[in-house]
Regions:
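N-terminal "arm"/small-domain region of PLP-dependent enzymes with the aminotransferase-like
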Residues: 1-47, 59
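PLP-dependent aminotransferase class I/II
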Residues: 30-33, 52, 209-286, 291-294
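Short loop-beta-helix segment that forms the pyridoxal 5′-phosphate
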Residues: 49, 62-91
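PLP-dependent aminotransferase-like
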Residues: 94-152
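Helix C-cap/helix->beta junction micro-motif
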Residues: 118, 177-178, 207, 289
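Conserved PLP-binding catalytic core of the aspartate aminotransferase-like
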Residues: 129, 276, 286-317
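Active-site phosphate-binding strand-loop segment of PLP-dependent enzymes
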Residues: 130-192
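PLP-dependent enzyme catalytic core of the Aspartate aminotransferase-like
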Residues: 166, 315-316, 325-363
């Protein structure tokens, strides 16, 4: 059962009082300016939205040209907007129609599901617990001329681990040599203090075979709006992606909300401060509880603990993400969102209670 189904079931039975740590969106909530813009845009919903999101694409290009600099010179033509990141993942797969893809595991399940729509054969490169789930150089040995696409997620979901810059560089070089498309999901990179240095957007003019996925969903807490975007220098790919789905896929409200969100610099800064502070609090408490965890870079924490921990926490009104359905992961792997302190404290207290009662740790 999906986390959303469990949440709905529990809310119906218990009056909606469950604390959801399974969805890793910004704990600060949607910016007020975005909410105000949504309300203000209601007068425009009688008309069709801009079919290619012209104003939004222009705003995204301006944002990164100012933020990253380094002469990247993004234009509207480098950008495609979609009905959330998932919409663009499917459009990308349908536009390319690959025969063989390389996936890194564990990873976001939508990549594989989109590729299944194309009848694509997948090669799985497993990241190992014993190697801290870090991609190693040997992945390049899979990138031969028979491969059409590789999907990367930086930082990874669910582990939160960054791909080392030298590994990304090696992958891009090998893929360019063998004419392989590179899909890089950077939807959680906005939570990093050094995102400007880590993003591959600055390499957009160097690698024509690269497509970078971003979204407003997580960083701006806009999951219900459904708004994502992709950046590439392959204009032909963008045209194919437009033809791989329905037109008018981004609503007037979503386009207006995205433009407003891009002006929220202080909001991003305060979010990063909050996430870093609260992650350290959780790390410290996990150390006391002797819970194994991985220090990732995103707004969530990946950890390993007792089997059935999810069920134990649901009984206490807390929902976490069970990661046992990912390739290469078994029972006992979990992911939690980093939330505000009171919520994080409630989770820690629940864990202390569980380990006292069930494990007798005496914590």
């Amino acid at each position: 059962m999906k986390a959303s189904d469990i949440l709905n079931t529990y809310n119906n039975a218990h009056g909606g009082d469950i604390l959801d740590f399974s969805a890793n969106v910004n704990p600060n909530g949607t910016p007020q300016s975005v909410k105000d813009t949504i309300i203000g845009s209601l007068d425009n919903i009688a008309a069709y939205p801009q079919i290619y999101c012209d104003r939004l694409r222009h705003s995204i290009a301006d944002y990164y040209n100012a933020y990253i600099g380094d002469g990247i010179n993004l234009t509207d033509n480098n950008i495609i907007c979609g009905n959330g990141a998932a919409d663009l993942i499917y459009r990308y797969a349908l536009a390319i129609k690959p025969s063989k893809a390389v996936l890194v595991s564990p990873c976001f399940c939508e990549y594989e599901e989109a590729l299944q729509c194309c009848g694509c054969n997948n090669i799985i490169h497993y990241m190992l617990d014993t190697q801290d789930f870090v991609i190693k150089k040997d992945i390049c040995s899979l990138l031969d001329c028979d491969v059409d696409i590789i999907f990367l997620c930086n930082p990874n979901n669910p582990t939160g681990i960054n791909i080392p810059p030298d590994i990304i560089c090696g992958i891009l070089t090998e893929c360019e040599k063998n004419n392989i498309n590179v899909f890089i999901d950077e939807c959680f990179l906005d939570f990093l203090n050094d995102d400007k240095e880590r993003t591959c957007i600055k390499e957009i003019n160097r690698y024509n075979n690269m497509f970078i996925l971003r979204a407003f969903t997580k960083i701006y807490a806009m999951a219900g709006i459904r708004l994502g975007y992709g950046i590439t220098s392959d204009y032909g790919l963008i045209n194919k992606m437009y033809k791989s789905g329905a037109p008018w896929n981004v609503s007037t409200i979503a386009q207006a909300a995205g433009i407003a969100a891009l002006n929220e610099k202080d909001y991003i800064d305060s979010t990063r401060l909050l996430i870093n502070k609260e992650k350290q609090y959780i790390y410290n408490e996990f150390d006391r509880l002797k819970i194994k965890y991985w220090k990732g870079s995103a707004d969530y924490i990946f950890f390993k603990s007792k089997n059935n921990l999810k069920e134990d926490l649901i009984k206490m009104g807390i929902l976490i993400r069970d990661c046992s359905n990912y390739y290469n992961l078994t029972d006992g792997y979990y992911r939690i969102a980093v939330k505000k302190h009171d919520d994080n404290e409630r989770l820690i207290n629940a864990l202390k209670y569980i380990f006292n009662i069930y494990l007798g740790n005496g914590v």
